[in-house]
C-alpha cells in the first residue's frame, strides 16, 4: 500500500502533465483525452459467464438502441414497477442487499446496467448518456417508481427534468452528489490540469 501511493501520485501527475502539454499543440485531442479519463469507468463491467448470482435469478433482457446494447434484469411482480439506477463504476448487482426488501412490496423490479457497466455496451459513463438509457428502458417497462444511487441518483433527477415522465409517481435518491462541479474540480486537481483544460471540461459538462 505504501508503495502504491507514490506510484499513483506520479502516474496521475504524469498524465496531467502530458494533457497540459498537448493542450498547447492539439487542444481538441487534449480535451478528448481528459474527457476519456474522467468518463470511462475502470471497473463495474463483467461478462455473461461471470454474471453475479443475484442477477442469475432475474429475467435477463437486452434492448438495442442505435449502436447501444442496454442490459436489464427483471424480477416479476404486480403491475407496479420499480426501476433501479446504480451509480458510477457499478452495475445492477449492487442492489443485492435491497432486493429482498423490494420483493416484499410485490412490485415488479427492473434494474439497468448503465453505459459501459455490467453487460451494457459503451466506453463512457456520462449523465446525459445514462439518462438516455433510462428513457429507453422507461418507455418499455413504464416504471411508477425510480430508485437511484450516487451518480444514478443524480442521473435519475436529470432524466426526470429532461424527459418529464408523467408515469413516475415517486423517486428515491440515495447518496447523490449535490454539486457535480465538486467532482469535476477534484478530478482536475488530481491531475493538476491547467486552466485552459479545466474551463473547456467544465463547459463540456
Model segments located where?
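Conserved alpha/beta-hydrolase fold motif
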Residues: 145-147, 171
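Conserved alpha/beta-hydrolase
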Residues: 92, 99-121
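Short beta-strand-to-loop junctions in surface cap/lid or active-site-entrance loops
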Residues: 70-80
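Active-site glycine-rich loops that stabilize anionic/oxyanionic intermediates
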Residues: 79, 86-90
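An N-terminal hydrophobic leader/cap segment in hydrolases
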Residues: 5-62
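The alpha/beta-hydrolase serine catalytic core
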Residues: 168-205
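Alpha/beta-hydrolase active-site loop
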Residues: 122-145
Amino acid at each position: 500500500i505504501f508503495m502504491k501511493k507514490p506510484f499513483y501520485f506520479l502516474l496521475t501527475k504524469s498524465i496531467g502533465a502530458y494533457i497540459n502539454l498537448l493542450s498547447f499543440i492539439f487542444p481538441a485531442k487534449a480535451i478528448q483525452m481528459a474527457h476519456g479519463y474522467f468518463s470511462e469507468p475502470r471497473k463495474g463491467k463483467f461478462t455473461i459467464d461471470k454474471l453475479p448470482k443475484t442477477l442469475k435469478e432475474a429475467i435477463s433482457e437486452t434492448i438495442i438502441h442505435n449502436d447501444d446494447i442496454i442490459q436489464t434484469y427483471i424480477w416479476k411482480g404486480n403491475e407496479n414497477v420499480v426501476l433501479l439506477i446504480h451509480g458510477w463504476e457499478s452495475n445492477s448487482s449492487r442492489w443485492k442487499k435491497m432486493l429482498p426488501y423490494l420483493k416484499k412490496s410485490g412490485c415488479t423490479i427492473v434494474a439497468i446496467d448503465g453505459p459501459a457497466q455490467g453487460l451494457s455496451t459503451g466506453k463512457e459513463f456520462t449523465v446525459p448518456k445514462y439518462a438516455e438509457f433510462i428513457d429507453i428502458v422507461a418507455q418499455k417497462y413504464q416504471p411508477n417508481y425510480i430508485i437511484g444511487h450516487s451518480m444514478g441518483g443524480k442521473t435519475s433527477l436529470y432524466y426526470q427534468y429532461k424527459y418529464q415522465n408523467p408515469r413516475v409517481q415517486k423517486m428515491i435518491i440515495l447518496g447523490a452528489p449535490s454539486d457535480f462541479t465538486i467532482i469535476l474540480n477534484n478530478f482536475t486537481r488530481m491531475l493538476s490540469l491547467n486552466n485552459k483544460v479545466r474551463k473547456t471540461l467544465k463547459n463540456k459538462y
